[in-house]
Structures are given as C-alpha cells and as structure tokens.
C-alpha cells in the first residue's frame, strides 16, 4: 500500500509573537555579571527554564533568594531538595547591586520553600524588596512567594514591602 502526500497543502509560517530569538551571548553576559556581584542564583538557571534567553535579552531576571536548596520535593521543578544553609544577609545588597548593574526595570523575586524558617523567609522577601525599591525606584518588583505554611503574619510582612505585584 502506498501513501500519497497532498502537495497542495499550504505551509503556514509561525506568527511573529511565537517566534523566539535565541541570544545565548546575552544569557552568558548576564550570568557572568551575576557571578561578578556575588554568585547570585536565578530561578531561570536553577529550574532550567526554557525561556531564559528571552527574559535575559529583555533585561528581566527572576532572582532566587534564600539559597538554591528547597525543603520540598515538587515533581514539576528542578530546584535541588535538601537542608538549606542559613539566611545570607548579604544577599539583600547583592540583589540590589545586580538590579542596578544590569539596569533591570522589572525584577521578579522568588525563593525555594523554606520550611526550616519560622516565617518561611518572609522577612528576607521584605528586606530585598524594600532595598530594591529604595535604591532603584523606577524598577517594578514582582514577588512570587511560597505558601509560608499558611502563616498570615508572614504574608502581611511581605505585603508591607511595597512590591508592585505579589
């Protein structure tokens, strides 16, 4: 049995909004700058996000605060699971320095789940966000927070940070 191919079919081009320019040099450049200011982690790198080049080329970055080790094991995420290190207070300055150095206008701050901390990391979210807003007032800050184990006080503290989007 032979199969015939209809050669009259029209080949459609992908719409412009679906096309993605891959700019690996921009990605490498931003990763090197992040290393230069203290080896910060981005969720883009840790979770092996397929859109990393797109975000970096648009001068957007999602910073992973509170380390790169999660206390939970979610099947959809590639972030390492284990016992995290203590909170790094110098991270606040490092994130803000990166925002200023890279000229970022939109920043997302997220973290792995930190069930080992009483507030789930809410105070660090507050401090990082406040510092960015204070030193780079034109930068919009979105925070993607963990569930803080349902702790209402932790959520209230994060809201007080003044983030543009929670």
Please place each PLM-identified region on the residue numbering.
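Flexible, acidic/Gly-rich N-terminal and inter-domain linker regions that tether
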Residues: 1-72
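Conserved Radical SAM active-site core
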Residues: 58-166
């Amino acid at each position: 049995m032979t199969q015939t191919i209809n050669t009259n079919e029209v080949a459609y081009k992908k719409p412009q909004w679906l096309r993605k320019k891959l700019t690996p040099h921009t990605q490498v450049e931003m990763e090197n700058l992040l290393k230069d200011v203290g080896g910060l982690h981005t969720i883009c790198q840790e979770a092996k996000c397929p859109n990393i080049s797109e975000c970096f080329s648009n001068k957007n970055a999602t910073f992973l605060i509170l380390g790169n080790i999660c206390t939970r094991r979610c099947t959809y995420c590639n972030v390492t699971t284990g016992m995290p290190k203590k909170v790094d207070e110098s991270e606040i300055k490092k994130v803000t320095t990166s925002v200023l150095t890279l000229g970022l206008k939109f920043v997302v701050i997220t973290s792995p789940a930190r069930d080992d901390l009483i507030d789930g990391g809410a105070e660090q979210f507050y401090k990082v966000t406040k510092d960015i807003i204070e030193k780079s007032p034109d930068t919009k800050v979105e925070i993607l927070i963990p569930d803080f184990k349902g702790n209402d006080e932790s959520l209230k503290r994060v809201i007080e940070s003044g983030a543009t989007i929670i």
